Amino acid sequence: MKTINELQDEVIEEFSDFDDWMDKYQLLIDLGNEQEPFDEKYKTEQNLIDGCQSRVWLQADLVDGKVIFQAESDALIVKGIITLLIKVVSGHTPDEILDSDLYFIEKIGLKEHLSPTRSNGLLAMVKQMRMYALAFKTKMEG
């Protein structure tokens, strides 16, 4: 399995193929549409991420010591953003997730091309993923 940094570098490479942000937004939408279907049973208040303008549900499970994320959003670009985050961090250990520096967000210019509310939502998604990783780490050590 590739490291988080190797996966981030792949994302940076994929986005560097496009100069126009309309093309990059389309790539995000396409990524969201390619995502595995989200099980309706996980669309609960508990799985909703606070701080997002649109509704985003994030489900996490610990499988063989690795955190597996699934997500859904009612907004196409946001669904693409959460899919991108999942592509990079899902399938790694809690420690790997907690120790990661998600530099790809800056490198592809994502944060600066989002509205302030979407940018806050992005930060909320990352924070929630780290919270799940921390909870699983604590559970494994406990």
PLM features per residue range, with description:
Residues 82-92:
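Alpha-helical support elements that line or immediately flank enzyme active sites
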Residues 9, 79-80, 98-99:
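A generic alpha-helix surface/boundary motif
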Residues 91-108:
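Glycine-rich phosphate/pyrophosphate-binding loops
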Residues 73-75:
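A short interface-forming secondary-structure element
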Residues 66-70, 79:
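Short small-residue beta-strand/loop micro-motif enriched in glycine and branched aliphatics
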Residues 1-12, 16-55, 62-66, 105-141:
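N-terminal intrinsically disordered, cationic/polar leader segments
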